[in-house]
């Protein structure tokens, strides 16, 4: 990322398919960014690439041009069936996969290539039918694609001649590395397959993956003067936890109408912050794991069209999303990972534009600041929290945005979105037989672990009668369970059964010897008649025997004494 994001290298200078050049020009792409100018000379002839570049530098277009040009000018593998894909593009998140698919269709719709978008959270059967019909390029997240690959009748990767791994470092962070290796082993060998890998950082584990599954990849690094975008104006405030919402409202009132993204660390705070902004009259969208996938796509589309002013999101939206015109990025919570900070503020000042990144360092997350400043190799300017900033300015009357009234989701509030999300999640758990309140959710029979005093049929349980002191407890057989009552009536009482049973004779031992005259042991359970008192058994103590004199040869002292006596008597 530099002040000049575009180079003098043009796409027409490469040996590209004429239809591809026409599609790029119609989409407005004429000159290359630095990562594109480095990647295309290596990737177009068929070489493997391990590229490092920060977010917003045009990595997506670099590998899309290489993939489409190969499919247009080269024939498919000999053993490929018409429905088998020829290219696979893997992304770590759904939002990034959707963005890649949107860019691919933008300038590749007229090339005759068939694209399929595969990710979780949407209709499983529709995606399966699309794959069974046959596609040329699959753009997917690893988890959902593996489900289809394991069903061999759905999709096979044996004829996939080019593979792209985007945001490889994020793949490791999300635990997808085993899934990636599983998919790579289902493709042709690395000598036949072309692999393009892109990452914000080429760490040791990323390079290990590259050299394990790639064919002598060429390492390409876009040198930058700073890790963060040069046109991002960064500043940080140190508010208390109680001042964060007030400070956010005060700063937003001073940038009225600007497209803004607010990042928080947890899904719970997405709803809390969004509700606060909505109460103050802002048009707010939310993006987190709790929001259903279709609703996330709808809200993101409305934000891109300008129908929403603010998008409150977790780090699910920090990578890969290209939204034009984002002027302000707020780190309501400082991220734990310094790389996430770079990706968050990378949503603004893309491709040479300018933007502001404003961070709040509260008591809970301020400890992340030293690591962030060490990673970006610069100090973030500190601004004071004044009483003026804590006072929001009066807002102008809201002006409806074109096309907002025709949108079906325009009237959805933040509370409605999260309530529908919770209801949908509860219905999904109920359908699967899970949940605490549904069948199968309780560990102790039916009822689902109810704590409101209701029985399995929903009716209140009768109050238990108090027990009279001295009275034996009654059998636990109710009229609601006639089988249990019948079995209990036929079973003899414990006292009668124990009285009829003969006592077992026990042989007691003391010091390893049986004791004569020991009485038989009583039954373990009480009997109606009291047992006779047992007479104590007297054990006769045996006298201790004196130690026996040693037998055999005399001792050494005895022999010495006899020898001395014989010597004396001989004199």
Swiss-Prot record:
Annotated GO MF terms: ATP binding; ATP hydrolysis activity; RNA binding; RNA helicase activity
SUPFAM superfamilies: P-loop containing nucleoside triphosphate hydrolases
Helicase ATP-binding domain: residues covered: 40-220
CDD domains linked: DEADc (cd00268), SF2_C_DEAD (cd18787)
Gene3D superfamilies, per the entry: P-loop containing nucleotide triphosphate hydrolases
Function: DEAD-box RNA helicase involved in RNA degradation. Has RNA-dependent ATPase activity and unwinds double-stranded RNA.
Protein name: ATP-dependent RNA helicase RhlB
Organism expressing this protein natively: Xanthomonas axonopodis pv. citri (strain 306)
Name of the gene this protein is made from: rhlB
